[in-house]
């Protein structure tokens, strides 16, 4: 490995330092922060008057529905158990049956930060802010539990009577084998009753946290919307600050998410835009989010029907993409132009295909590392031969550097000639590493945020989506963390071995530094990374070491360059002449 190769590796290491520090959970960036407050939605989301003293003052025409008794019913399908309350016709609980939280209890998606997750929000002509969670609906089911399975379907309807000709109907539709729930809203007699001629359908309270590492989960929690082909994210990154984002137009969906789960509102028709809100209290990792769709109410017409779908479930790429609403855009796979294509079109499809036959993700990662090593073998072979040639050329290059130390232009010219005659590229040794960087970064995003690896163990690693900690230190070492993970130690050892057996130039101070510095940096980088990523890089290096032994044993003297330090003499042209 020559000076240029060392420089290239150092630059790659610098890129990793900057990138990994940027991605560190404890330095969480604000994804999108806006304090703009458009008047149309500001009226809906901010109280307009002091707290009233009576139901009539507070709710006006809705006062008759402000008192009642909440009745709850449970709808259970193959995937979740949903609880609906007649107060607000809202979801008060949604428990996923196939996923466990950090305490090994079924995941609860509805947080306790709000009195129910779903509601309609609107402003009356008299200036009263109405949230349907404050009102009591009739209807529902006389049964307290209804079970639906397979392809079976079940619907339940709630009704809110305001006056003789004015009412609200809300209908939930469940399917036995789906995370998707139909949600239909019918407004009768409201064409001239609402200020701004709009209402909002909102999910309030964010999502309940499910992981042991609350700080890491907060790093991934956010509210989002998809409008005009662009993803808008709102992240309540700082304590005691108001975060708001509002846009007009046709939103395809709004959603709130934590690290591995999402709740999304997907309209069947056009919308008037969206509104996102977020906050975080000091001393508490939980980030509270609200996401709402703005729906227009025509000034004419006796009734309005709007249909929506609710997706409440895991951030499983195949399931989320099957919603056909581009909801997969809320999954963070890094840069759209670089790492996301690797994640969506290589890593996830290959993992999904292999999982049909192999149900151990540790083995899948090992096989995937072998396949990548196999695909990159031609590059590795060319790189190794290039480095071996560079090593053979080092005495000649040193002689040239001494000979032309006072003539840089001549030195560069001679170096170029030597490289050309030998058929080597000074940076050829870095090429395989550079080409694998996008894949490595994409795997970081996949392993960090995809639910496929969550709570799947391998050997001593109990969960491939988190570090494989074998010892908690009780204190934090800067850039390293508060624990010792075994996978990064083994991986750093393979990096050291690989460098030792890789052809290099004559031993110099640069190479001695890189021999120890690069494994040390990798140890620091990977200690807080998902153990699945460490397993991939560990096995990739093991295969690289085996490959290097093979290449070293099959390279012959015939592969070495045969060049001279002296430039080839130019042949003199013969003079044309007559006879002898």
From Swiss-Prot:
The chain crosses the membrane at residues 5-25, 259-279, 362-382, 427-447, 477-497, 513-533. It is a multi-pass membrane protein. Pfam families: 60KD_IMP, YidC_periplas. GO terms for molecular function: membrane insertase activity. One of its GO terms (biological process) is protein insertion into membrane. It is found in: Cell inner membrane. One of its GO terms (cellular component) is plasma membrane. Keywords: Cell inner membrane, Cell membrane, Chaperone, Membrane, Protein transport, Transmembrane, Transmembrane helix, Transport. The keyword Nuclease does not apply. NCBIfam families: yidC_nterm (TIGR03593), yidC_oxa1_cterm (TIGR03592). Belongs to the OXA1/ALB3/YidC family. Type 1 subfamily. Interacts with the Sec translocase complex via SecD. Specifically interacts with transmembrane segments of nascent integral membrane proteins during membrane integration. Required for the insertion and/or proper folding and/or complex formation of integral membrane proteins into the membrane. Involved in integration of membrane proteins that insert both dependently and independently of the Sec translocase complex, as well as at least some lipoproteins. Aids folding of multispanning membrane proteins. This is Membrane protein insertase YidC. It comes from Chlorobium phaeovibrioides (strain DSM 265 / 1930).
């Amino acid at each position: 490995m020559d000076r240029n190769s060392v420089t290239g590796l150092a630059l790659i290491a610098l890129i990793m330092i900057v990138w990994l520090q940027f991605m560190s959970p404890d330095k969480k960036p604000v994804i999108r922060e806006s304090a703009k407050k458009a008047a149309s939605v500001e009226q809906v989301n901010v109280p307009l008057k002091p707290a009233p003293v009576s139901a009539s003052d507070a709710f006006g025409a809705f006062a008759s529905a402000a008192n009642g008794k909440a009745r709850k019913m449970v709808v259970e399908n193959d995937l979740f158990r949903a609880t609906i309350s007649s107060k607000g016709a809202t979801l008060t609980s949604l428990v996923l049956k196939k996923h466990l939280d950090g305490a090994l209890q079924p995941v609860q998606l509805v947080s306790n930060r709000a009195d129910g997750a779903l509601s309609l929000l609107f402003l009356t002509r008299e200036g009263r802010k109405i949230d349907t969670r404050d009102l009591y609906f009739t209807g529902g089911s006389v049964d307290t539990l209804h079970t639906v399975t397979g392809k079976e379907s079940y619907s339940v309807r709630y009704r809110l009577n305001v006056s003789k000709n004015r009412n609200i109907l809300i209908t939930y539709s469940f399917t036995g084998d789906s995370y998707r729930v139909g949600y239909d809203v019918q407004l009768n007699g409201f064409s001239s009753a609402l200020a701004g001629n709009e209402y909002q359908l909102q999910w309030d309270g964010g999502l309940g946290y499910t992981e042991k590492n609350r700080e890491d989960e907060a790093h991934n929690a956010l509210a989002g919307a998809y409008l005009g082909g662009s993803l808008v994210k709102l992240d309540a990154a700082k304590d005691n600050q108001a975060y708001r984002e509002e846009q007009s137009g046709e939103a395809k969906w709004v959603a709130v998410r934590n690290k591995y789960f999402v709740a999304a509102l997907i309209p069947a028709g056009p919308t008037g835009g969206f509104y996102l809100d977020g906050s975080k209290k000091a001393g508490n990792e939980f980030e509270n989010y609200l996401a709402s769709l703005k729906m227009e109410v025509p000034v004419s017409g006796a009734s309005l029907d709007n249909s929506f779908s609710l997706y409440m479930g895991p951030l499983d790429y195949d399931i989320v993409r099957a919603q056909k609403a581009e909801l997969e855009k809320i999954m963070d796979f890094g840069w759209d132009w670089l790492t996301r294509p690797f994640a969506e079109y290589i890593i996830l499809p290959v993992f999904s295909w292999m999982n049909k036959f192999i149900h151990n993700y540790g083995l899948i990662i090992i096989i995937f590392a072998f396949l990548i090593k196999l695909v990159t073998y031609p590059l590795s072979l060319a790189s190794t031969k290039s480095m071996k040639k560079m090593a053979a050329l080092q005495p000649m290059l040193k002689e040239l550097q001494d000979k032309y130390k006072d003539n840089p232009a001549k030195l560069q010219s001679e170096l170029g000639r030597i490289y050309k005659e030998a058929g080597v590229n000074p940076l050829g040794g870095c090429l395989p590493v550079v080409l694998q960087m996008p894949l490595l970064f994409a795997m970081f995003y996949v392993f960090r945020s995809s639910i496929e690896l969550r709570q799947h163990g391998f050997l001593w690693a109990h969960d491939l989506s988190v570090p494989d900690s074998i010892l908690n230190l009780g204190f934090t070492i800067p850039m390293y963390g508060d624990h010792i993970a075994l996978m990064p130690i083994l991986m750093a050892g393979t990096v050291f071995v690989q460098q030792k057996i890789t052809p290099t130039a004559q031993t110099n101070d640069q190479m001695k530094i890189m021999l120890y510095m690069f494994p040390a940096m990798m140890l620091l980088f990977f200690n807080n990374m998902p153990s699945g990523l460490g397993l991939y890089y560990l096995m990739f290096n093991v295969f690289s070491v085996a490959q290097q032994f093979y290449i070293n044993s099959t390279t012959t003297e015939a592969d070495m360059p045969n060049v001279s330090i002296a430039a080839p003499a130019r042949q003199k042209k013969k003079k044309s002449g007559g006879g002898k």
